[in-house]
Amino acid sequence: ILSEYDIILVQEVRDADLSAVNELMNQLNSAGGHPYSFVISIPLGRTSYKEQYLFIYRSDMVSVLGSYYYDDGCESCGTDTFSREPFIVKFSSPTTQVQEFVLVPLHSEPSHAAQEIDALYDVYTDVVNKWRTNDIIFLGDFNADCSYVTSSQWPSIRLRSLRACEWLIPDSADTTVADTTDCAYDRIVACGTALRQDIEPGSATVNNFEKKFHLQTKDALAVSDHFPVEVTLKAQ
């Protein structure tokens, strides 16, 4: 699954010493395909339970230009916005029409999903001010559906109504592997005129690897309980 992509965001990584990440990278790079590198956040979270954001990328296609953590306030005071604040990465991509873009990951806290998704508007403003670009992709498990974000909450979520941005994975999508759920938890939101024009029409989709590899649900769930969501940028 990973080797289908040039850049992948992996979430819920709990591997402070990077032993599992290094093993994964060794397997990915020994598969004989393309060379992959990675950039990973520190463990993030308000309690002893912490997660890392991991970006794996094809080093012959793209490179990392910079990264920073969004400052969402005082964690110890309990006034921070995000359970796992975005680890924001700027990529150089010489082969696509847009040659630089920014990726902003979010794995939201389910019980505060609407507030956290709304706060991505402030992250948008922060990136624009810091890096002078709005060619930004927000992506990740936003928990943006079903009981966590209801239809009545969407109108107050600022990122949803931001004219510069387009929600590429619709509310009708099902990004969950389980047969018992039908939720569009995982999203890709593309911002900026140049970046949005660079999106291959119809390419934003859910990668249903269960169907693709003819797996039983229990075997698919052993890979992940979510399907990847994906989008393609046009080559020059």
What are these regions (language model features)?
Residues 1-236:
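Divalent cation-coordinating acidic motifs and surrounding scaffolds
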